[in-house]
Amino acid sequence: MTMISDLSKDLVEEILSKAPITSLGAVRSTHKQWNALSKGRLLYKAEAKDQFLGFMVMDHRFLSMIFHLNGILKGDGEGFDRPSIREVGDIVNQIDISKVFQCDGLVLCVPSDNSSVVVWNPYLGQTKWIEAREPHDESDMFALGYDKDKNHKILRLYDECYYYYEVYNFKTESWGEEDHLPGWDIDSYNRGVSLNGNTYFLTQEQRAKDKYRVFLLCFNFTTEKFENFIAMPFKYHRKYVGTLSCVGNEKLAALYQRWDTGEMAIWVTTKIESNEVLWSNLFKVDMKPLVRFGFQQCKDEAGSFFIDEEKKLAVVFNLDKKRGKRNNKTRCYHTAYIIGEKGYLKKEVLGEAVEVRKDVYRSALVCSSSYVPSLEKINQIEEEEEDKCKSIKMVDTKRQRKKRKRKSKR
């Protein structure tokens, strides 16, 4: 009979790679070797090249997603597997989620009731509810990051006129003093992107001579200040769309599309320093065959996307509206647009979108980088209980040893 301990390391890694993201924590209790491998499991070689593993919010449902990239660029479509999307059976799926952010293996969810936020560690299965000082508005922006000591924090940015902001500190379990960002505009639909603890936004200078100029703005979670306004390699206009993503934990990526021409460009950073950011154009493509009027840019949303730099492709999530021929009724579908260099275009429908209110729909929001498991404990009560259990076990073990010694002497 084959035992778990008889399985090779390669086979165990293959089994773990097939396990859902949210089941990794349960795997740890199966066997000591599996526990060690799952702890060290970032992304296996096959996954890093062939799959995107992450989270998304679609119609207020919190979902895990595996997007298969292997065979995606074949012209005949053979070898392409549809993305695997499933609901997460956890406390975060017992509520309506409006926004989702990811940083360092932790996921920040903003419920639709606007009274609190919840941070979740999918690997450990821990959640931490954080009450807001006051109910937040639908247009408020959030970000998750950490300081130089790896202490995690949450940024809340609100009031589109004056851009006030406050920071929640996990260590002190409290919100800090209110501050504001003078002279700059950050569109609420453009979510920030977390990279190496800091969060980056696209912004424009208020009352500037060149009103179409776009800047990259960094929020530093160590200083808890906005800094480094660095010009982007493109300009904004009513007919232009721009949004950010990232490439692993090393680079930023920017999507830029002109609605008038249908041209889309993907840019990737080659250098990120405090006073200088350099960009390289990954590829350009004409989107008119797939999207007639360009990606939609609505309140609380812009086309979220992720890229595979090696394959030179991007997967953009947005809405695709179709008008019925018989009843003239518009139906809206969640759609993944797979875009690559040399004009590669493919459209994958994920399902029909739910109407938020009359003729209003919300695009799916996707975390921009593959999920990397974290051992960061975010629930202090659970952590204290676990430490107590360990202490009790140690005491019991010592008592048992003493009893055995007494018996041996007799």
From Swiss-Prot:
Chain intervals for the UniProt region annotation (Disordered)? 386-410
Q: Matching InterPro entries, A to Z?
A: F-box-assoc_dom_typ1, F-box-assoc_interact_dom, F-box-like_dom_sf, F-box_dom, Gal_Oxase/kelch_b-propeller, SCF_F-box_component
**Segments forming domain F-box:** 2-49
Annotated Basic residues bias: 399-410
> Which Pfam families does the record associate with it?
F-box (PF00646), FBA_1 (PF07734)
Q: Where is the composition biased (Basic and acidic residues)?
A: 387-398
Record's protein name: F-box protein At3g19890
Task: Provide the species name.
Answer: Arabidopsis thaliana
